[in-house]
UniProtKB/Swiss-Prot annotation:
The gene is fbp. It catalyses: beta-D-fructose 1,6-bisphosphate + H2O = beta-D-fructose 6-phosphate + phosphate. The keyword Hydrolase applies. Its main location: cytoplasm. It comes from Azoarcus sp. (strain BH72). GO terms for cellular component: cytosol. This is Fructose-1,6-bisphosphatase class 1. Disulfide bonds: none annotated.
Length: 333
């Protein structure tokens, strides 16, 4: 059986008119950066990359050494290619401009360089999330405003999960496809075509330690799940929580489920916990392309108009029937 590489897959997408040559090359550069990050993650303590870096990011969170390393790898890999007008990183406060001595292109790249980095020191799966937008026509120079586009305008989105194997999960608007890194070949191999999320599920992911802070619709929904066969749902559910969005969403894309980081009293002043541009939008695009749904509990995530680069929102995504049920509970409240 012929093994198809990521490059071959993207060339076929280009021939079918689904991606431009520049977008294809941009995704390949991101994939090369992912390989480099994967090497650093897998070495761990052997390379002295565990622990905190001694600095805080724009979110006020203590950075891990690998946060800083992954961020630099992505910035440096993508600066020179000529495909980008600018970049934005969850770890950096302002827009990252392309140096003057490099050519500029027609796309904007956003990324969370190392999602779930609090898990690094305990050897649990982490990941990289990315999103691609078009640079608005008619603008001379990219600014923060250039990035203020709803998630439905994304032309590509994806993530890498660094687990027992490294996988790159990608959509360019025509289904969700996963590629597994063959370390001997040095290539991503097409292993999971057209990933789909079932409409129904028996698994849910939420940080139950925050239960006392949840709004009533979420308390009602989770309470019904916990009641199991003897409750209103008439079946048992299992709870899963990795505290790494990439790992939790990857499980949902693989076998279904619902992921929730809802609005609660702890994060109400911030608008939510997760970042719209770096986490919610790309994951929402992937989930919808796989047949699932993604909302804040009140609105479709991909319809939200961002107002700032590091905006936070509630996130509820996964199996369509469950997401619609939670959203209905919010409407009723």
């Amino acid at each position: 059986m012929r093994r198809v590489t990521l490059t071959q897959f993207l060339i076929e997408q280009q021939r079918a008119g689904r991606v431009s040559a520049d977008l294809r090359l941009l995704i390949e550069v991101v994939a090369r950066a992912v390989k480099a990050i994967s090497v650093n993650v897998s070495k761990g303590a052997l390379a002295g990359v565990l622990g905190e870096a001694g600095t805080d990011n724009v979110q006020g969170e203590a950075q891990k050494k690998l946060d800083v390393i992954a961020n630099e790898i992505l910035l440096q890999a993508n600066e020179w290619g000529g495909h980008l007008a600018a970049m934005a990183s969850e770890e950096v406060e302002t827009v990252h401009q392309i140096p003057f001595d490099y050519p500029k292109g027609g796309y904007l790249l956003l990324f969370d360089p190392l999602d779930g980095s609090s898990n690094i020191d305990v050897n649990i799966s982490v990941g990289t999330i990315f999103s691609v937008l078009r640079f608005p026509e008619g603008e001379a120079e990219p600014t923060e405003q250039s990035f203020m586009q709803p998630g439905r305008e994304q032309v590509a989105a994806g993530y890498a999960v660094y687990g027992p194997s490294t996988q790159l999960v990608l959509t360019v608007g025509h289904g969700v496809h996963a590629f597994t890194l063959d370390r001997e070949m040095g290539s991503f191999i097409y292993t999971h075509p057209f990933m789909t999320i079932p409409d129904d599920t028996h698994e849910f992911a939420i940080n139950a330690s925050n239960a006392r802070f949840w709004e009533e619709p979420v308390q009602r929904y989770v309470g019904e799940l916990q009641a199991g066969k003897t409750g209103p749902r008439g079946k048992d559910f299992n709870m899963r929580w990795v505290a790494s969005m990439v790992a939790d969403v990857h499980r949902i894309l693989t076998r279904g489920g619902i992921f929730m980081y809802p609005l609660d009293e702890k994060c109400r002043a911030q608008g939510g916990k997760l970042r719209l541009m770096y986490e919610a939008n790309p994951m929402a695009m992937l989930v919808e392309q796989a047949g699932g749904a993604a909302t804040t509990g009140r609105e479709r995530i991909l319809d939200l108009m961002p107002t700032k680069l590091h905006q936070r929102v509630p996130v509820i995504l996964g199996s369509r029937n469950e997401v619609e049920r939670v959203t209905a509970y919010h409407r009723e409240s």
